[in-house]
């Protein structure tokens, strides 16, 4: 494969796909999408939520369609929207029931299917082995079952999204390719081949995962495979089951922001637990941060970055005792902060409780201070707990001065700071220095005029894109809000699978299939378990339709099985079923104890 063009982004050229009254594709603006959380059969409630979503700036809305009752409800929903002159496209979300797709396409503008469960049964981890003959027979069966929907969509001029989800691949695909990025890509391509063979091209693809690293790699790989075949289909971007609050925003921004910066993506959704209304401002801010990249497209040898870190340079940590060989987080402290802050207050902002001696898991490894302040009493106090670096200890490289990057003085320093103003310049820096093993501290400044969400999105997109490719040795954050800086720093490191210092939560955004108050339960479980050690991943999923599969890499799962009942999972195995919801949280704690990961809060 040729070395990709990684320093410049061009919007990947894609076909225009009509969805109702709007078009999706590279010649059109990137659209924002969401999904209702009401029961689809609640026509009044669903219509109200759709209208509210449009008022907030949503361009496309999706509803769940489990069966024929929901199909009939969609007919009424669409009629109601037309009567109210609401033109937002309506999308039907289909799982396990092809007949629902065939019927509902009459009244909606697009259908979304999951290749993992549209024709084949989902993977039940039985260990079944498919022979080549059985595999070929399954592909023929796929063609026979899927082609009626393709034919009807083509005849009616309706669009389709082929939405692959990591963890819900079919048994057949998983047996041959594993629950891998390769499996995700081939799952999509099998369905794409049917569409192409039938000359149907109103198709959009998505490759979602709750893990941004997997998600980004899957989209890059699919885009490459599609373009190799000259299939210029649009992409819908999203990190599925991103969770709630700041952590959910960070995950979404790391994944979606990285791909937008590479010119990939024609529609986006931030799948946050709670009201879908809350997703829209985050999407708007995310697109605003990438406006320049999102509004232009062009040709390049390879306009998105399919590459390994070896093509860009190796990642060497500073390896400073007692830091050790980890990707560290440093906080920049200005002379103003050091001169005006109360010592106890500043230490608390850094995560250090001087009364109890307790160190927060999100305490940075060190701070960077002006050399003139090194001997001050407040810095001496900080040095009792953290590493302290003089700002003048290493060169601070100008992102616009390429000669400086490779100068003898620069290369002879023990490490360097590189100020990251944009992703593409940083990638060029690492590309030009790909043979250097010199540690690089990625330095980020945040505009103090940004809102909190804007700051979260800006840093997550810029830093996350580099971390996902394994670039840099540590991170230096310079932001007036020290506590926010360290919280964000570790959340981004965790989202990029670099470090895990706190419990990670996977939770779906909710939809018409959700069987309990997802946001309230998620918050209660978080409150009961957030003191547990980092590296643990807990999933809270609204239903069993996709919950068990889409929480693919979670250690423990809390999944709605039927109204008022919860199933508990260890990895992908259900170990306790049909637990009354009022007992389920205590049963989850007991399960954590049985597996030796529980400890009592201090």
From Swiss-Prot:
Binds 1 [4Fe-4S] cluster. GO terms for biological process: isopentenyl diphosphate biosynthetic process, methylerythritol 4-phosphate pathway; terpenoid biosynthetic process. Its cofactor is [4Fe-4S] cluster. [4Fe-4S] cluster binds at residues 508, 511, 543, 550. The keyword Coiled coil does not apply. It is an enzyme of class 1 (oxidoreductase). It catalyses: (2E)-4-hydroxy-3-methylbut-2-enyl diphosphate + oxidized [flavodoxin] + H2O + 2 H(+) = 2-C-methyl-D-erythritol 2,4-cyclic diphosphate + reduced [flavodoxin]. InterPro entries: Dihydropteroate_synth-like_sf, IspG_atypical, IspG_bac-typ, NO2/SO3_Rdtase_4Fe4S_sf. One of its GO terms (molecular function) is 4-hydroxy-3-methylbut-2-enyl-diphosphate synthase activity (flavodoxin). Pathway: Isoprenoid biosynthesis; isopentenyl diphosphate biosynthesis via DXP pathway; isopentenyl diphosphate from 1-deoxy-D-xylulose 5-phosphate: step 5/6. The keyword Oxidoreductase applies. Disulfide bonds: none annotated. SUPFAM superfamilies: Nitrite and sulphite reductase 4Fe-4S domain-like. Keywords: 4Fe-4S, Iron, Iron-sulfur, Isoprene biosynthesis, Metal-binding, Oxidoreductase. Its EC number is 1.17.7.3. Pfam families: GcpE. Belongs to the IspG family. PANTHER family: 4-HYDROXY-3-METHYLBUT-2-EN-1-YL DIPHOSPHATE SYNTHASE (PTHR30454), 4-HYDROXY-3-METHYLBUT-2-EN-1-YL DIPHOSPHATE SYNTHASE (FERREDOXIN), CHLOROPLASTIC (PTHR30454:SF0). Converts 2C-methyl-D-erythritol 2,4-cyclodiphosphate (ME-2,4cPP) into 1-hydroxy-2-methyl-2-(E)-butenyl 4-diphosphate. This is 4-hydroxy-3-methylbut-2-en-1-yl diphosphate synthase (flavodoxin). It comes from Chlamydia trachomatis serovar A (strain ATCC VR-571B / DSM 19440 / HAR-13). The gene is ispG.
